[in-house]
Amino acid sequence: MVQNRDMGIQHIGARKDHRCYGMGLGIIILDDVYPGFPGDVRNASAFPFPVQYEIVEGVSIAVLVYEEDKSPCLEPIKRAAKKLESMGCRAIAAECGYFAYFQQEIAAYVDVPVLMSSLLQVPWAQQLVGPNQVVGLFASGREFIRQQHLDSVGIVPGSNYVMRGIEDYGQVHEVNNLWTEGIHPALPEAYYDKAEREFVDIGVQFYQDYPNMGDMVLE
């Protein structure tokens, strides 16, 4: 049995302003009640090392994604990030791609590496595929991705990427069951096999729409 510890440690020492030890990654999660499949950022079993979660109080999907004015989100996110840092996390991530909006502010606010969104991978993927291919950016809701989301993670307007959302290919019922405001039940649930089929189907359609797609990044 592999244990999540290092039995070879013979000496320990405090780090300035750090309260806890042993967790490498701190994860900011939304103030929403929904489950995560194994492999989901919200499910700690996805990681082969200890993680520390922090709820960003008052910031739900409805607030972060749908609200026009996102400024009320900033201070709660900063508090969550600072708490994770002070607890001893060596890096901070966030569970939802729409946190990209605040990448620059949070990276400047704490002294550990910050990865607020999977969209950070897009510029890297663009370099990998070269200028003659495009990177597909697949979002849960394309209409809610603003220019600041892209600017904050270094995605250059007009560069070699294309973006689509679930709404471009119809409904994904298991997504609605988990996350869609006004549709999901009070205690959301979903079935993995159904979700997998729906996501793969629309991902394949997206790829087929762009024969020069060299990579795809999921928001």
Sequence positions of predicted segments:
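Gly/Ser/Thr-rich loops at beta-strand to alpha-helix junctions
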Residues: 33, 91-103, 115-121, 140-145, ...
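A short, acidic, amphipathic alpha-helical segment used as a generic capping/interface helix at domain edges
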Residues: 194-214
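N-terminal glycine-rich anion-binding loop in soluble enzyme alpha/beta folds
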Residues: 2-74, 139-144, 148-191
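Generic structural signal for hydrophobic
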Residues: 83-84, 106, 206-209
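Long, hydrophobic/aromatic-enriched structural stretches that serve as scaffold segments
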Residues: 71, 75-101
